[in-house]
Every structure is written in structure tokens, then in C-alpha cells.
Amino acid sequence: LRGLREKYADKLHIRIGLEAEYFPAYLGWLREETERLGIEYLILGCHYDTTDEQDAKASRFGGSTSTAHGRRYAEQVVEALETGLYRYLAHPDLFLNRMTAFDADAEKACRDICAAAARLDIPLEYNMAGLTLQDRPDGSLGYTRDEFWRIAAEYPVKAIVGCDAHAPSELDVVPAIEEKKAFLHSLGIPVLDTLPGLE
């Protein structure tokens, strides 16, 4: 990437970022590697509650139906955001993915995440790829959820619209980006096109 940035410096402005987990035991290593590799920003993506060497049964947040696991997700996200290491939070409502009801526990987790993002001025990602995970036959909620964003609108948060790049087919959602930006604007949530400090 650094080579491409130099090669096309007169045509493109390339930034180097990385989505990373939050595991307290590895935070020092993550800081060192970020600096050593010249990574300009980190995106928080909480997918697992711990590493597999710490617990062979480490659970995936997006795969759990447990409300307790949803609370753990919110706690871990808030703790991670408070480190100041991450520029924004990817798929903030990921924990809802396999849940079958948006209940009081889910609402509290959403509120805890939004309150921390507002307090720390860290943008929340409206994850376009999550839109393909809704309306499942098994009744699970999926994500990205309007319920989350309606709660987010009660806090002074900012959003950034993102699209996972796991496979080229995930870019099929790109035509809907403007529609989703309009939805966020209708809720009164400012949508960022660039991250502060990386203009």
C-alpha cells in the first residue's frame, strides 16, 4: 500500500487503515505494530469476546442469542473506545445478528454504545453489508438495524457509511448508500465522508 501511495501520489490520496479487535492483553502489541507498519488509523471491530488461546470456546458476538453476551459486547466496545486507539466503530449493532427479539437488554446495550460514542466523539459505522443479513427464515434479527439507529439519534453521534470488503459481491449494496445516508440524515444523524484528521 505504501508503494501504491507513492506511485499514484499525483492521482490518489491513499490512507492505510485496519479493522482490529480489542483484546486488552494484546493492546500494547497492537499499538506497536500500528506504529511500526505506518497504519494511519484503526477501526474497532469487536467480533469475539476473547482470544482462542485464552478460551478455546471464545464466542463470536454476531453468533450468539444470549442477552448476557449482548451486554458483554457493549461493555467490551465501551472499554475499547475509551482506549483512544480506534477512529470509529464498525457494525456497532453486530451483537443483534442472531438474536430473535429486540428487548430491553438489547436496547440498553445499544444505549451504552451510543452514549460512549457520543461522549468520546467516535463515529459509528452504518454497515451496508449487514443489510444482506436481514429477514432470515429463522427469525434472527440480523444487522444493520433501524432500531439501533433510532436510539443513536437520541445521542449526539456521527455516522460513517461503510461496506465490508470480504468478497466482491458485498459491493452489490453500494447503490443503496445514498438511500441509507438519507435515512441517517432524516434521523438527524450527521454522516461523515471522511474521518476527522484524515482529510
PLM segments and residue spans:
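Extended substrate/RNA-proximal surfaces in nucleic-acid metabolism proteins
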Residues: L1-L120
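Charged catalytic cores and adjacent phosphate/nucleic-acid-binding surfaces used
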Residues: L96-N97, A101-E199
